[in-house]
């Protein structure tokens, strides 16, 4: 009588033959990342956001609905909310630079401001408190074809001799002819000219991403409440800030300019390709049918989904979430399967495969009432912008 092992051999042959014919596949069986029902994920995300908002506002429970005054918001509160919302939108529109770009040599380009004799300056209201510097964005795009290639941008100004100390502020030309504060500088008296440099990398990336033709900066004297005279005393080569508010003619090639440091397009071709391959952000995920890890849309209506009326603005927002498998190349027929088996043995509750998690998050500005007093708050990390496998 043959041994028991030999008696079982005919039964095992079909199974062995099936394994031979089956191509190597990712070790999905070793992953503990479970597939979750989409509706269940959405419900859990909504409940998590409910607790997240209350926790960030340090509220044990939602305010009483009867405490919310009827009618529109005060103009000052609405203006503060709108400016906060615009600032967040502007910052989120900035493309994220790629770390790989630091490897390549940078090409340095100088883009001069538009001459003040150009008629585009006629649209700007002259003031003894400020000077204005406008730039043609077509020249910027010629130097830097894509925002992601920009490594650094500096606004360079040649300050002439200064008799008195002055505090100056730099502003960016923004939407609706408004100006957004960027930075400030305390200038000491000096008998010799001095180059001033402002880091405006984020601003120039915004300009390269938008379709505008003319963008610019404003340099203003700091306006203190106890000062009667806030006239700009600083003279910039190529400009004049006289008390009449006139702008002088250009003085040679040392007028204000943008110094751009960028990776040349021909050196960053593979960077461009890899960026699109890895960019699991809303621009890619919302316009594709990607089944692997990606950002999934989720709009939360505060009244409908949370039953809240105490948040006055916005009425809702796109919270989004990350979902999808993260495939990897470890197959069952490789040495890594032994490592994974050992890992699972010692960490039974952990995941051997990467999971889809948020990478970039954005804040959410809100207006809500405490009693009858409206408050504007910015809640951090409320909107999923991109995902990654980790």
UniProtKB/Swiss-Prot annotation:
Region described as Arm domain: 75-271
Keywords, ordered alphabetically: Cleavage on pair of basic residues, Disulfide bond, Extracellular matrix, Glycoprotein, Growth factor, Mitogen, Secreted, Signal
Post-translational modification (record): Transforming growth factor beta-1 proprotein: The precursor proprotein is cleaved in the Golgi apparatus by FURIN to form Transforming growth factor beta-1 (TGF-beta-1) and Latency-associated peptide (LAP) chains, which remain non-covalently linked, rendering TGF-beta-1 inactive.
Secreted is among the record's keywords: yes
PROSITE patterns linked to this entry: TGF_BETA_1, TGF_BETA_2
An example Gene Ontology CC term for this record: extracellular space
Region (Straightjacket domain): 30-74
CDD domains hit by this protein: TGF_beta_TGFB1 (cd19384)
Family per record: Belongs to the TGF-beta family.
Protein name: Transforming growth factor beta-1 proprotein
Organism: Mustela putorius furo (European domestic ferret)
